[in-house]
Amino acid sequence: MNTPVDGGIQIEVVRVFTDATGGFGNALGIARAGDVIGADHQALAARLGYSETVVVDNPRSGTARMRIYTPTVELPFAGHPTVGAAWWLADQGTPVTTLEVPAGPVAVAEADGLVRVRARPEWAPDFTFHEFDDLELLATVDPAEFDSGHHYLWAWTDRRRGAVRARMFAPAMGIAEDEATGAAAIALTGRLGRGLEITQGRGSQLFTDYDPDGWVHLGGRVVPDHPVML
């Protein structure tokens, strides 16, 4: 039986998909599984209020099991939690090559300052994609216009380079607007069949590569933020 979160738990926080200076990025809460035994993980995520919070087991033989929560639902997979948790585990001195999430095994690598994960586009939630031709119009869309579903709004900024400007609204997950959405980046990459450089939210940056066999590699920068106590 799960019990309410009653205090004394330290939650680590990182920002995922920052720009090259460490700015912007999407905050991720990270709880060690051993610190929240018997606790209500969903209530923990709701109390923290981040777009996602993860509960991570201690790694064994280069693999760590992980569960992912938005403020309202548990997810089988998400991009920014896997990238962020992979970086955090390496920073703790326990790097992994695989994260086990409910959707399946997520391969992890790090190169050129980016943490990269490999995932299937079908692991992403069912996004509705809205392509815009006008960047100014994209910037004016009010998240309050969307009261259900998962909506990814995007426009090319440089089609030749694969550069995209994007926003994401997910009221179904309890997220009015997400700063950086890895799963949506993976899904869009799969739809377009090409690698992308995505700027989302206030200025977060996501990078993808597409494999002809259907796998997508998602990468980004991660920086530590201040931990919080519950």
Question: How would you name each of these model-derived features?
Answer:
Residues 1-230:
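Active-site proximal loop and beta-alpha junction motif in alpha/beta enzyme cores
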